[in-house]
């Protein structure tokens, strides 16, 4: 609703800072009130380690990090990649992603803010390069068909699909099946004593 939207836009700090910092493997991540960050910090580290292991980076890869949020995964894997491009819908999150790269001395990341299906196009791929690896961590609704189509066009060697909704993840995997096979699956219990789970899937080009 417009009322809820107005509340979201209004922001007032009554005391203290307007952000917090999370740390992971010596990296510091600034997180603001409008930015997405995993609520279970300890398990978030395990989740991102699984994603990084599945990516199989050697230092030569161009990586696309879709739905990058505050750039946590992008910056986390940047030391093992040649370059990482992160895309996220929320502009404030992308500003935090850029700050996070700067405060950690990371110079091989590039971030874009906007609707995924509008930014990630064939023209974008042609301009910035075909990714060797795509890491995608979409919201519960999963990926838009247009995004899936561009991923299939780009044909990265590996896709690491992180999901908080196995149902929409399964739907998207079915769409990717025309060119990709599932090589590994690793659930991560982000929310103990609930039915929710984060699921990480590694896909490789057939």
Regions found by a protein language model. Name each.
Residues 1-2:
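Blade-terminus and WD-like Trp-Asp/Gly-His loop motifs, strongest in beta-propeller folds
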Residues 5-206:
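Rossmann-like S-adenosyl-L-methionine
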